[in-house]
Amino acid sequence: MSDIIKRIEAEQMTKELPEFGPGDTVVVQVKVKEGSNERLQAYEGVVIAKKNRGLNSSFIVRKISHGVGVERTFQTYSPLVDSVEVKRRGDVRRAKLYYLRDLSGKAARIKEKVK
């Protein structure tokens, strides 16, 4: 039974996404349907968590919009996620950056990873 599920999940996990992780600043192009037309909306922010669970993989992106922190969870292999572009690599020592929720301003900055 689980072999069949694995094969079906593998068929649906065909989307090519760049390697990214917590601390990286990404731009996610999301398909938004407004009435009869569909357009792409860019959502730029810092990845604070990534969950690798096969087809159920997801990641959380946090940004500050008009002084208010906004977090959005994206399903990695969702048809609504058009593309993910890595703007800058962050150098962090944690897998989950939930502590950024309590920080604001300069304290919430993340060092850039040196190549």
UniProtKB/Swiss-Prot annotation:
GO terms for molecular function: structural constituent of ribosome. Keywords: Ribonucleoprotein, Ribosomal protein. One of its GO terms (cellular component) is cytosolic large ribosomal subunit. InterPro entries: Ribosomal_bL19 (IPR001857), Ribosomal_bL19_CS (IPR018257), Ribosomal_bL19_sf (IPR038657), Translation_prot_SH3-like_sf (IPR008991). It comes from the Bacteria. It holds the Pfam family Ribosomal_L19. One of its GO terms (biological process) is translation. PROSITE patterns: RIBOSOMAL_L19. Belongs to the bacterial ribosomal protein bL19 family. This protein is located at the 30S-50S ribosomal subunit interface and may play a role in the structure and function of the aminoacyl-tRNA binding site. This is Large ribosomal subunit protein bL19. It comes from Hydrogenovibrio crunogenus (strain DSM 25203 / XCL-2).
